[in-house]
Structure formats: structure tokens, C-alpha cells
């Protein structure tokens, strides 16, 4: 089974992916972790590395390559804002493609708690990062990140806790056509 899950920062994709991975024994591959590791390798902050990635397409190419390679082996949950798009462009059809969304301030509060930052700083970083990513996705892939038409399910994650979001997805997985 191949599942993709995407969403902007703070929507709960990592928490949800881990729950799905544990329940169904799927390998968890996260584009964000790959991106963060690459930033650390270059001794850059996420904002610095996002700016660097805007003019250095090898960053996205490497992340894409790793995602496609992982998906070809099957039995995984692929987490990333473009995971669904990358597989579509590579002619790999996931069994289920999910997008999580949440109110920007809810996301900001979640990020500030996760990163142990004050809310104002988290908001500033979030806005900067998302603008950088949106620009990069359009320029490199001709993808509008706001186009959710490729997803089977879109969930407003601020309405439920992590288990509530997982329960919705669990029902969807259980009811997939064989």
C-alpha cells in the first residue's frame, strides 16, 4: 500500500503519518526530514536553506529522487507537501492521497510549541518559509500548492485532535476498494 500525506507546516502531517505507519506497518518517508537533514549538512537554517533551494534545483531533484525511489518499493506512507504531486508526475498511483489543512494561527501555535519559539517569531518564519516554497514549487514544477484536486481526502485538522484525524483516515483505508 502506498499512501501520500501532505499539508502546510503545522497541520499535523508528521504526527498523522507516524500513527498510520505504526498501525499498518508502513515505512515512513518524510520529505521534510530529508530537507532538514540537507539544511543541517550545509550548516543552514530552514529559512536560509529555503532561499538557497530557490536558486539551486538540485535540492528539489534530490528530495524527489529519494521519494520516488522509496515509493517504487511500495508499502510506505510518503509525507511531504509535494508527495502526491511527485508520484503523479512519476506515474506512480498511490492507493490513497491525503491533504491536511488548518487555520494559519492554529498552525503557527503548533509550530511555536514544536520549535519552542514565541508565536510572533514562529509566524514570521512560517510566512517566509511558505512564500519561499510556493514560489519554488511554481517555478520548478509548475505546481500551485493550493490546488488540492489530486487528493482523495482533504481534512481540516484543527477540528480534531491527532487521534480524531487518524480515525478518519483509518476508516478511509479500511473502506478502500480492493
Curated annotation (Swiss-Prot):
Keywords: ATP-binding, Cytoplasm, Kinase, Nucleotide-binding, Transferase. One of its GO terms (biological process) is pyrimidine nucleotide metabolic process. It is found in: Cytoplasm. GO terms for cellular component: cytoplasm. Its EC number is 2.7.4.25. The keyword Kinase applies. InterPro entries: Cyt_kin_arch, Cytidylate_kinase_dom, P-loop_NTPase. The keyword Transmembrane helix does not apply. One of its GO terms (molecular function) is dCMP kinase activity. ATP binds at residues 7-15. It catalyses: CMP + ATP = CDP + ADP; dCMP + ATP = dCDP + ADP. Belongs to the cytidylate kinase family. Type 2 subfamily. HAMAP family: Cytidyl_kinase_type2. This is Cytidylate kinase. It comes from Methanococcus maripaludis (strain C7 / ATCC BAA-1331). The lineage of its organism: Archaea, Methanobacteriati, Methanobacteriota, Methanomada group, Methanococci.
Amino acid at each position: 500500500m502506498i499512501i501520500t500525506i501532505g499539508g502546510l507546516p503545522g497541520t499535523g502531517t508528521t504526527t498523522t503519518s507516524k500513527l498510520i505507519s505504526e498501525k499498518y506497518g508502513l515505512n515512513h518517508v518524510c520529505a521534510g526530514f530529508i530537507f532538514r537533514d540537507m539544511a543541517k549538512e550545509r550548516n543552514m537554517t530552514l529559512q536560509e536553506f529555503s532561499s538557497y533551494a530557490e536558486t539551486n534545483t538540485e535540492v528539489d531533484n534530490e528530495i524527489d529522487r529519494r521519494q520516488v525511489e522509496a515509493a517504487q518499493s511500495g508499502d510506505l506512507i510518503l509525507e511531504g507537501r509535494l508527495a502526491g504531486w511527485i508520484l503523479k508526475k512519476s506515474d506512480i498511483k498511490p492507493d490513497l492521497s491525503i491533504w491536511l489543512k488548518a487555520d494559519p494561527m492554529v498552525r503557527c501555535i503548533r509550530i511555536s510549541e514544536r520549535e519552542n519559539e514565541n508565536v510572533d517569531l514562529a509566524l514570521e518564519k512560517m510566512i517566509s518559509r511558505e512564500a519561499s516554497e510556493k514560489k519554488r514549487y511554481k517555478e520548478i514544477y509548475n505546481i500551485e500548492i493550493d490546488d488540492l484536486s489530486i487528493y482523495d481526502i482533504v481534512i481540516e485538522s484543527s477540528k480534531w485532535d491527532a487521534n480524531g484525524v487518524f480515525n478518519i483516515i483509518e476508516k478511509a483505508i479500511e473502506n478502500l476498494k480492493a
